[in-house]
């Protein structure tokens, strides 16, 4: 994979950088600027080299139309604060305003182009249409840096097609992500433990299939665990269940046994009379995993399982975690996710290499107040890190080879 140093001397050069600024907003207030901060090392390095830094990114799903509430204006403002520099926002992605703002740049300046997904061609399935659009963006720059790890699993105009038109390389963030995820999956120090949670088994099928012969231990919680418990013959009450995945999951349980992979499931769960929303009161109770009442819904792993999961994680040299253990947004059902996060922090302190997969696990770690430096690596890509763990070829990385 080509990296920044492969681009040579960038002084005075116009460098297009595809970043991942898809941040959560409350109105125009950014509620988590983690993704913006993750892009700073690449931006600062390029500025120090005297490049003209032209940033592009998407925000939300405007579906190819201009949606004012999804403008990157709040991102430009926050970037300016973090860099201590003015970051003008172009009114378009490649039109007159973008061209004028780029033409006015001095060495070391930073400009942000407006939301690439305001253009229908950005996510078009028609390769020719995307390529023609990418050429218009590429005309603004003299080199391309791919630094939005959150989008490398998609072939889109601003991260895939642009790479065909300009000398292209991975930015520092993408390089760091690929190194960390490769280290965990290609040659992990053992014991290698994979912790999976989140609501659906179907989202994690590929990861389980790819890692069933690589991991020493699979630890499973979250909503997806009830399909595992049901596959073992337990009743799961009104808990989330994917009936159509039962046969697959039975197969995984058999394969794990055959491969000598330790499969760790909760021994107790925290249940409630239903999902804690609207009129449903929060009245948690702890029951054995094989004795969930017919009218109750499992929403977290129980205290015994929290200790079990924590100890299994600490007894590891490599840990990859993707997906929360319960409905962590509700304090009564957050203890399982906290226990797993604490397990990773304790394992890291003891010398293990730990990765928090992007998406919900990363936001859980932040929302629950864990320090980012307590983990070896917190991924910025939800879908991208999952597909990497599935062993898939990611189009946005392939074009940087």
Swiss-Prot record:
Lineage, top-rank taxon, reads Bacteria
Disulfide bond residue pairs: none
State which pathway it belongs to.
Answer: Carbohydrate degradation; glycolysis; pyruvate from D-glyceraldehyde 3-phosphate: step 2/5
Query: From its record, what is one biological process in GO terms?
Result: glycolytic process
Write out the GO MF terms.
Answer: ADP binding; ATP binding; phosphoglycerate kinase activity
Q: Which gene encodes it?
A: pgk
Name the chain's protein. Phosphoglycerate kinase
Which InterPro entries does UniProt cross-reference here?
A: Phosphoglycerate_kinase, Phosphoglycerate_kinase_CS, Phosphoglycerate_kinase_N, Phosphoglycerate_kinase_sf
The record, for SUPFAM superfamilies, names: Phosphoglycerate kinase
